UniProtKB/Swiss-Prot annotation:
GO terms for cellular component: plasma membrane. This is Phospho-N-acetylmuramoyl-pentapeptide-transferase. It catalyses: UDP-N-acetyl-alpha-D-muramoyl-L-alanyl-gamma-D-glutamyl-meso-2,6-diaminopimeloyl-D-alanyl-D-alanine + di-trans,octa-cis-undecaprenyl phosphate = di-trans,octa-cis-undecaprenyl diphospho-N-acetyl-alpha-D-muramoyl-L-alanyl-D-glutamyl-meso-2,6-diaminopimeloyl-D-alanyl-D-alanine + UMP. The gene is mraY. It comes from Burkholderia mallei (strain ATCC 23344). It is a multi-pass membrane protein.
């Protein structure tokens, strides 16, 4: 919004050219989202408390968590407000990637809001059924996947439609340009051509998978928000590089016109996330809820797909991956041993993984900070792939 205004008025006021610089707008988006979160936080927490949307704690979880029962949840709306305002103020609203990321983020946020609402109203920690949740996630994820398959490959929406029609006329067998290939970290001239169907399948898996992985990780005060901020900031760097014809050529990445604008979104997400951490740090005054976790995970997955860094997201989001795998392994092993031996056995003391460490004697704050440190190291490793190729 402010970019369009600056472009319109810069002939009358030369200082407004500052607003056309992507890095300046990214910094301002971070500050805007941070200030909005810090200022609106007490009001949002107070309203959530008045609405009596307290968190229902799992009875089979760690006993130390029982004191958290009744803490306001659905605080993810505070993050989404900060992201929305900062992105709309400082982003280029003609950029197609901004809108598709916003669509996925807020679409998944609505799913999470319904899930949280059911948990609060019916006092049931399970919320929406898994089938219902995955159905709506799949609807949004598949829509985004189909659009991005052609959007990443072309420079504007007109050419996106032309490419889509060419694919239809080919009998759904036409391939995609090289910039839509799966990029392999550390290899500068080797990529894997996915084709339209492969791109759609991978994108769906990344978006929906990232959303649920972040949601599973959100189990301790402050645990998930800092990794989201770190991974989001790192993806913002990739977006800046991929969106620049100069830097992408120098670093041997495919140039994706318009991708650089995602730096604004990632910056807004970082600022909003830090503001939320102010109130979510131990002992938490508010919980993110599914409305925040599902939305942020979907956002990370979508940005990673656009900048063609799905594998790097897997690396930098290693904590999310480990948490998800711990649940999958626990459930699979329990069912297998129950069928084979008549008694279910566990690999971990409790899943997701952060509960295993809690029951192993780690304090909650130790688990949280150590997971932050691991994520920081993984993000630095992921960023190293910019040059080590």
């Amino acid at each position: 919004m402010l970019l369009a205004l600056a472009q319109w008025l810069q002939g009358d006021a030369s200082f407004l050219r500052l607003f056309t610089y992507l890095t300046f707008r990214a910094v301002m988006a971070t500050i805007t989202a941070l200030v909005i979160g810090l200022v609106c936080g007490p009001w949002v927490i107070r309203k959530l408390t008045q609405m009596k949307v307290g968190q229902a704690v799992r009875k089979d979880g760690p006993q130390t968590h029982l004191v958290k029962s009744g803490t306001p949840t659905m605080g993810g709306v505070l993050i989404l407000i900060g992201i929305a305002v900062a992105t709309l103020l400082w982003g280029d609203l003609t950029n197609r990637f901004i809108w598709i990321v916003m669509l996925v983020t807020f679409g998944f946020g609505v799913i999470g809001w319904v899930d949280d609402y059911r948990k609060v109203v019916y006092k049931d920690p399970r919320g929406m059924s898994s089938r219902e949740k995955y159905f709506w996630q799949s609807v949004i994820g598949l829509f985004a996947a189909v659009y991005l398959a052609f959007s990443v490959s072309e420079a504007n929406n007109v050419r996106v439609f032309d490419l889509f029609m060419a694919w239809v006329r080919s009998g759904l067998s036409m391939g995609l340009p090289a910039r839509a290939d799966l990029m392999l970290p550390f290899l500068k001239s080797i990529s894997y051509p996915l084709g339209v169907w492969g791109f759609i399948a991978l994108t769906y898996f990344v978006i929906v998978g990232a959303s649920n992985a972040v949601n599973l990780t959100d189990g301790l005060d402050g645990l998930v928000i800092m990794p989201v901020v770190l991974v989001g900031a790192s993806l913002g760097v990739f977006a800046y590089v991929m969106g620049s014809a100069v830097y992408s050529k120098y670093l041997l990445f495919p140039h994706i016109p318009g991708a650089g604008e995602l730096l604004i979104f990632c910056s807004a997400m970082g600022g909003a996330g830090l503001a939320f951490l102010w109130y979510n740090t131990h002992p938490a005054q508010v919980f993110m809820g599914d409305v925040g976790a599902l939305a942020l995970g979907g956002a990370l997955g979508t940005v990673a797909v656009i900048v063609r860094q799905e594998i790097v997201l897997f690396i930098m989001g290693g904590i999310f991956v480990a948490e998800t795998l711990s649940v999958m392994l626990q459930v699979t092993w329990f069912k297998y041993t129950k069928k084979r031996y008549g008694e279910g056995r566990r690999i971990f003391k409790m899943a997701p993984l952060h509960h295993h460490f809690e029951l192993s004697g780690w304090k909650e704050t130790q688990v949280v900070v150590r997971f932050w440190i691991i994520t920081l190291m993984l993000c630095l490793f992921g960023l190293s792939t910019l040059k080590l190729r």
